[in-house]
Regions:
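Non-catalytic, mostly N-terminal accessory regions of nucleic-acid modification and defense proteins
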Residues: 1-98, 165-174
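Conserved S-adenosyl-L-methionine
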Residues: 79-190, 195-196
Length: 197
């Protein structure tokens, strides 16, 4: 399955969901020896959570956030994740507004992005606001596992087509990244990518 997903042939105008699947599995290794166990895990989650219900999806998101806290300490290839209290504080200080773009060029599992989304979610009142909310974030993550976790995090925060990319932002000119038509980002909320390889 991993090899098949990593080698998907994509049309030039492929939907972002297809691009995300290919990118997520390109560098992935399958350490699970038993496919039946994976199926059981998927079935258990599917039976327990109705992802069409906001409250259940939100509760699952909180569980997911708790699991991600385990990654906040060093030890995974020298990676450091910013504590949630810090990401929340920084987002509150920058106070992004609905309609502004928020970028994190070393987004890890999406801590800064979700802190910004939590502030933006309070401003959503109409379907038009929801559309602005869903297009407000932009992220780049070099490593495959944090990238996958970030995509999952965005989906749990009602971002159906996350503008999060599997890439190394240090290998490109920051001006090459475009979000809005004018190529500008309103808010850059991030820590530099120190540590890791």
């Amino acid at each position: 399955l991993f090899k098949t997903l990593a080698s998907l042939e994509l049309a030039q105008n492929a939907p972002l969901r297809q691009v995300v699947v290919k990118a997520a599995f390109t560098d992935a290794n399958n350490y699970m020896k038993d496919g039946i166990l994976l199926r059981q895990v998927v079935n258990a989650i599917d039976d327990a959570v109705d992802f069409t219900e906001y409250k259940e999806r939100h509760a699952f998101g909180e569980i997911y956030e708790t699991i991600l806290k385990d990654l906040q300490s060093a030890g995974n290839a020298g990676e450091f994740y910013t504590p949630r209290a810090v990401t929340d504080f920084m987002a509150e200080m920058l106070n992004p507004k609905l309609g502004e773009s928020v970028a994190d060029f070393a987004c890890g599992t999406g801590g800064f992005l979700t802190s910004a989304l939590n502030l933006l979610a309070r401003q959503v009142k109409t379907p038009a606001d929801q559309e602005l909310y869903s297009k407000s974030i932009y992220g780049i993550e070099k490593k495959q596992l944090p990238y996958l976790l970030c995509i999952t995090n965005m989906l749990l925060h009602d971002i159906d087509n996350p503008q999060v990319f599997h890439d190394n932002s240090l290998e490109h000119d920051v001006r090459d990244y475009r979000h809005k038509e004018d190529g500008q980002f309103d808010v850059v909320l991030m820590n530099p990518p120190y540590g890791g390889s």
